[in-house]
Amino acid sequence: MPKYELEKRTNVWYNKNIQFGRKKGYKVERDNRIYIAIDLKSFYASVECVERGLDPLTTNLVVADAERTQKTICLAVSPSLKEYGIPGRARLFEVIEKVKEVNCARRMRAPGGIFQGESSDALELSASPKLSLTYITATPRMAYYMEYSTRIYNIYLKYVAPEDIHVYSVDEVFIDASGYLKTYGLTAKEFAVKMIKDVLDTTGITATAGIGTNLYLAKVAMDIVAKHVDADEDGVRIAELDEMSYRRILWNHTPLTDFWRIGRGYEHRLMECGIYTMGDIARCSVGKDGEYYNEELLYKM
């Protein structure tokens, strides 16, 4: 489903969930709903690592067509390679330059300033300064990634009805968990962990999750807050938000582009009006008609 259509379907989604809930003998009020957003970690890169029998969390790998120019965009960068400051959608020449920079620093720590080998494994590199950093370049296989995505979707179907799973992209879904927590006797976090662990055990791919009292909070919990949560032994990060914790944690968070659906252009227009944070936006939305900061200012953006 195109991302811009997700918000349009919220009311339809709610109505379907209520109907499904009645069939199952329960009804979850709209104010008490719980949503889980799940994002498969560096999905394309993880698939390529798994297919090579490698650990997706410790293998340095990029998904890119190396036969094109070095300006080609990497479709994915593995987590261990991101640790060197390489963004998820870097161009190939940026990866090459960063690896050169890292190896220059590593060479200074190598015995005699000479490398005695190379490795694309983060654990081996951490254990031995004698090795130079290298990485695997995997040619994109989009049809294969779609097959993996379908397999993972079918795993989710073991736990929830299709009416309650909403595919956001090839590697990301929203799940309305409201009617299932009581049935399974689990908290929202435990339920998320249960599904993610099943995906990991079945495919070797881990994930990050956000839990919220609405779609937006689940998404933001996953995109922003989970990044600051310690990962478990499987690399899983899960964060939760409700309306109050959102205000407490993210009211003053910057940059605004970290938030769902706020791009650089919109951020720039907001900043031109003296609006820099979500707290500023909220205060503007309740401003009175005679004040400079009021909701009309936001509507004109």
Named regions from a protein language model:
Residues 4-6, 20:
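Cationic, low-complexity basic patches in intrinsically disordered or flexible, solvent-exposed regions
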Residues 13-301:
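Gly/Gly-Pro- and Ser/Thr-rich, intrinsically disordered tail segments characteristic of DNA damage-repair
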Residues 1-3, 14:
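Gram-positive cell-envelope targeting signals
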